[in-house]
Structures are given as C-alpha cells and as structure tokens.
C-alpha cells in the first residue's frame, strides 16, 4: 500500500482538525489536567496530571485574552481542546469555544478530545450550541 501526502496509509479524507494539525495550523489547548479516569496509559506529566492548569501550545495561560493572543501569534486556523478531560471543566470549555468562535468566526475549526464518562446528551447539546465542530472519544480501556 502506498503512503499518502500525510505520511499515512489512510487514503480517505482526514478530518479537518487533523489536516490543520499536520500543517501546523491548529492551536493545542490543554484545558485541565483533571480527569475522572485513571488510565494506566495516561501520558500526562506530573506537572499536569490531576492539576487544574491551562496551556495553549505549552504556554501557560490564565485568561481568554492570552488564548486569543496565542492563536493570533501562530495564525491558527483551528484548535484542539484536550486535557485530562475538558468536560471536567465544562464551563471553561464552553467559554473558550465561544470566545474563539466569536473572535475568529464560525470557520475557525474546533475539536475536542474527551471520554465517555462525563458525556451526556445535555453536555453534547451545550457543546454544539457553543460552536464545537468535532468530537473525539477516548475509549474506556482501563
């Protein structure tokens, strides 16, 4: 099988978030280190694991203003929200999604990585209403 232009063997279209990431156009938002799970394979460092800290591209941030600044510095076309579990801090997650969409417009692609543990229909509706474009679930393997 032949590799594609993304150095992968997948010959279908990659999700938009993946396309931006490969091109270096996606800001990574580490929303919190808090997570309801204790997966044996969790890659978080001791500085982040189960700690309520926020980073944008490994830059510590404490405000929405700093989030926007980091996105502008890298000319981001989108953002991926990860953690811990971003749904452990749902209000913050919703605030950051709406802030980015309001500042950059609806074309700014936002996806989130989360677990099924905190995912409910009302939570999904709030994420959709805030402007989330894509969601990726980590399976329960522990």
Where are these regions (language model features)?
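Canonical Radical SAM [4Fe-4S] cluster-binding loop centered on the CxxxCxxC motif
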Residues: 2-8, 13-61
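A short, flexible N-terminal coil/short beta segment enriched in small residues
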Residues: 19-32, 73, 78-80, 84-87
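Conserved short hydrophobic patches within well-ordered secondary structure
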Residues: 30, 80, 93-96, 127
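Surface-exposed amphipathic alpha-helices with a cationic face
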Residues: 43, 94-105, 128
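Core AdoMet radical
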Residues: 47-61, 74-89, 103-119, 123, ...
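Generic structural signal for well-ordered alpha-helices
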Residues: 67-68, 93-98, 124
